[in-house]
Amino acid sequence: MTDYQNEVLEFERIMKEHTNYMRNSINLIASENITSSDVTEAVASDLAHRYAEGQSHERLYEGCQYIDEIEDRVIDLSKKLFNVDYANVQPISGVTANLAAFFGYSDYGDKLMALDVPYGGHISHAKVSAAGIAGLKTISHPFDKDIMNIDIDAMNKKILEEKPKIVLFGGSLFLFPHPVKEAREAADEVGAKIMYDAAHVLGLIAGGQFQQPIAEGADLMMGSTHKSFPGPQGGIILSHKENKEVIDNAVFPGVVSNHHLHHLAGLGIASAEMLEFGQDYAKQIVKNSKALAQSLYERGFDVLCEELGFTESHQLAINVSNIRSASDIAHDLANNDVILNKNLLPGDNVDDSDNPSGLRIGTQEITRRGLKEKEMDEVAEFIKRVAVDKENIKDEVREFMDQYTTVHYSFSQNEGYRFHKL
């Protein structure tokens, strides 16, 4: 065996170890999920090798007839799932979807009104990422940290004063619906587009368990397809058909060349799964988030927004500054196969993001593994035993998660976390 053949075996070994690690872990990362075996097969198909530049039936390459059929089906399923009459399924990520929307409806120097990162905004809403690439000047939504949401009266006043070109809702720490319909009148008065970054809550929207941004008055909804929505990594833009020409051109040739066709097929399969199972899945996610938040609160954790029921999404947030460093807690939990992330909270210094006061938790992946409210109490106890008591619980976590290896809310109902050797 040559050294380079051995490299192939080493990659295989590492991937197998990673797969086993995820199988054995309580994964509470709010931006991840697990796909069904049907979606995984699509992602591993020959489509991974192909190109299809341009819109369906208007390709720059030959040989795309089956790809056109796939894309047409994905678009139709997306429109049905989200009750819209336009969908672009070509963005390769949520950030790419945001960038296309910004390019389509703004000019260099225009203002974008969005949440600051410590208040839940995503980096793509900021100067350092997509907003800055598009040349937008970012201004901040007024925020009420007691309710972890935008201050409606102050927001409308600021829209009228600042006259942004884009009013953007959504974020990466996203506990409660945002005031979309409440902003419509002010946005219309200054000629602003309302956009909604649904990256985190797309699956909850699809399942009818969160706000419906387009119905509430948003002009565009962008999202990623792999968080609460259990598809392959990718992006999507949903809107009204009058925005089709602008957005299609902003996506291609604007920010996407080839749009990762294996993920496109996977998105179609995941969309069919959500049409069949999405309501039950999304409902259980929210139930689990509330149950986990309550269990942590009862163990003395400072879970945000107790008086509001903690959350209406897949996420919950904890201020652990009264315990010890959020970074240390997250690291210790990961060493015990409980995976979550440290997170900035309102009042934290955005320039010191390595030392925030909070932890962000998401329940969408463990929900898909079949855990329900009763199991959330056990998850909370694991977190407490590491964060507060500094115990070593890795073996117990692995034994616990060994009971939950099936991917639920899917047609195949197969065991997840398998290394697929072709």
Swiss-Prot record:
Catalytic activity, as annotated: 5,10-methylenetetrahydromethanopterin + glycine + H2O = 5,6,7,8-tetrahydromethanopterin + L-serine
Keyword tags? Amino-acid biosynthesis, Cytoplasm, One-carbon metabolism, Pyridoxal phosphate, Transferase
Query: What Gene Ontology cellular component terms go with this record?
Result: cytoplasm
Q: N6-(pyridoxal phosphate)lysine-modified residues are where?
A: K227
- Give the UniProt subcellular location, in the record's own words: Cytoplasm
So what EC number does this one have?
2.1.2.-
Pathway membership: Amino-acid biosynthesis; glycine biosynthesis; glycine from L-serine: step 1/1
Instruction: Please give the name of this protein.
Output: Serine hydroxymethyltransferase
Q: Which GO terms describe its biological process?
A: glycine biosynthetic process from serine; tetrahydrofolate interconversion
Cofactor dependence is on: pyridoxal 5'-phosphate
GO MF: glycine hydroxymethyltransferase activity; pyridoxal phosphate binding
Outline the subunit composition.
Homodimer.
Q: Which organism is it from?
A: Methanobrevibacter smithii (strain ATCC 35061 / DSM 861 / OCM 144 / PS)
Alphabetized Pfam families for the sequence: SHMT
Q: Which CDD domains match?
A: SHMT
Positions bearing the site annotation: Plays an important role in substrate specificity: H226
Recorded hits in SUPFAM superfamilies, A to Z, give: PLP-dependent transferases
Which EC class heads this enzyme's classification?
transferase
Q: Which domain of life is it from?
A: Archaea
**Record family assignment:** Belongs to the SHMT family.
Cite the binding residues for (6S)-5,6,7,8-tetrahydrofolate: G121, H122, I123, E245
Q: Which InterPro entries match?
A: PyrdxlP-dep_Trfase, PyrdxlP-dep_Trfase_major, PyrdxlP-dep_Trfase_small, Ser_HO-MeTrfase, Ser_HO-MeTrfase-like, Ser_HO-MeTrfase_PLP_BS, SHMT-like_dom
Protein role = Catalyzes the reversible interconversion of serine and glycine with tetrahydromethanopterin (H4MPT) serving as the one-carbon carrier. Also exhibits a pteridine-independent aldolase activity toward beta-hydroxyamino acids, producing glycine and aldehydes, via a retro-aldol mechanism.
